[in-house]
Amino acid sequence: MHNHVFKTIARHGLIALFFFFSISAMAAEVAKMDRIVAIVDQGVITEKELEDRIQTVIAQLEKQGTQLPPRDVLQKQILERLINDRLQLQYAAQTGLRVDDAQLDKTIERIAEQNKLSTGEFRKALEAEGIPYRKFREDIRNEIILARLREREVDNRVNVTESEIDNFLTTQSSRNDIQDEFEVAHILIRAPEESTPEELQKLKAKAEAALKELQSGADFAQVSAGYSDAPNALEGGILGWKASSQLPSLFVDALQALQPGQLSPVLRSPNGYHILKLLNRRGGSSPLVVDQTHVRHILIKLSEVVSELEAEQKINSIKERLDHGADFAELARQYSEDASANNGGDLGWTNAGDTVPAFEKAMNALDINEISAPVRTPFGWHIIQVLERRKQDMTQESARLKARQEIRARKADDAFQDWLSELRDRAYVEYRLEDKY
């Protein structure tokens, strides 16, 4: 009897002991994953958040075939990104920038369509890859917020003047390599404007250490992930193909001296230290000659008060008057609901892609001075007349457009880094990553 009781108690005791240790282990794991690795103003970044992002980046790098940098280097690089993202998201929330569920749903629908899937199929595909749909939604929401925040705070405030474009093109045309294009990889060690001489020396030493690793045969993408402060550091630092007009003179001069596969020395610019790798080079593009069409139209829009049938009847009535010799420009001024109405419907010279596909298809099918039958597009009902056609050398216009885009991109990138630095300077950031060890 006593032995039976003893055995029963012992068995229950072992069970209790098992549950005690199991619960303790689970609690320890939860505590570990909830451990704070950084305090960012009023928010925190947990070890779980950091680990989740690390695993995502590792999966991306492995998919690209990129050799992984040391874990501690990757960990610190990703933590910096998380801190910067968190600061921006906090600022966005404080200033009323939000993305509602309806906007988010539309974005996810577009992503699914790009993958040729329905939203339901896309959700199943995500879950099959081990990506929780709820987390994916919040990640996309945050990406939209970050993009809109940058657009609001930086991009919309960047202006490019005609004189800046003129100076840019003058500088580029003075170089014999104007037509060259380069495929480039890039590492940036950023040097803030307020850096002291001692800090600059340390940053330069960091760049030279990265270059030494590369010269010893290290993988460029791995060194980029471990050292670079560029936005694409974890994507191998690849800039892709760039015309010489799209690159700073400092870069072009260095690249001109390289053969594919070679590395530049450490280069100093106002925003830091750079290392370039020339992946490939090719001659530039030939003159850009495009087909242009001088066209005018009459537009009848659909609205809440104008039905499809009413709009179609109205456009048919206008077409009938044109067939009987009525003046196109006069009817456009009288009836067209497009902004071109005051100009008699004249849209001027158009390039391929300037108009929606249905309009362009109908326009391209017309002879000179021929008037189309009514054409339905997303804007409503049109009547189209082609006035002239020509081939136009758009090389100069294209060069100015590319120059404007390049100047704007450079100024926006510099302004964004300055803005982000100011945001960090105003914030309280405490690192606790070392507390783990």
From Swiss-Prot:
Subcellular localization: Periplasm
Superkingdom, natural source: Bacteria
Gene name per UniProt: surA
The name this protein goes by in its record: Chaperone SurA
Keyword check for Chaperone: yes
InterPro entries the record matches: OMP_Chaperone_SurA (IPR050280), PPIase_dom_sf (IPR046357), PPIase_PpiC (IPR000297), PPIase_PpiC_CS (IPR023058), PPIase_SurA (IPR023034), SurA_N (IPR015391), Trigger_fact/SurA_dom_sf (IPR027304)
Documented EC number(s): 5.2.1.8
A cellular component term, taken from the record's GO annotations: outer membrane-bounded periplasmic space
GO biological process, one term: protein stabilization
Catalysis: reaction(s): [protein]-peptidylproline (omega=180) = [protein]-peptidylproline (omega=0)
Species assigned in the record: Methylobacillus flagellatus (strain ATCC 51484 / DSM 6875 / VKM B-1610 / KT)
UniProt keyword annotation of Chaperone present: yes
Leader sequence residues: 1-27
A Pfam cross-reference name: Rotamase_3
PANTHER family, per database record: CHAPERONE SURA
Domain notes: The PPIase activity resides only in the second parvulin domain. The N-terminal region and the C-terminal tail are necessary and sufficient for the chaperone activity of SurA. The PPIase activity is dispensable for SurA to function as a chaperone. The N-terminal region and the C-terminal tail are also required for porin recognition.
PpiC domain residues: 179-280, 290-388
SUPFAM superfamilies documented for this protein: FKBP-like (SSF54534), Triger factor/SurA peptide-binding domain-like (SSF109998)
Keywords, in A-Z order: Chaperone, Isomerase, Periplasm, Repeat, Rotamase, Signal
One GO MF term: unfolded protein binding
Protein role: Chaperone involved in the correct folding and assembly of outer membrane proteins. Recognizes specific patterns of aromatic residues and the orientation of their side chains, which are found more frequently in integral outer membrane proteins. May act in both early periplasmic and late outer membrane-associated steps of protein maturation.
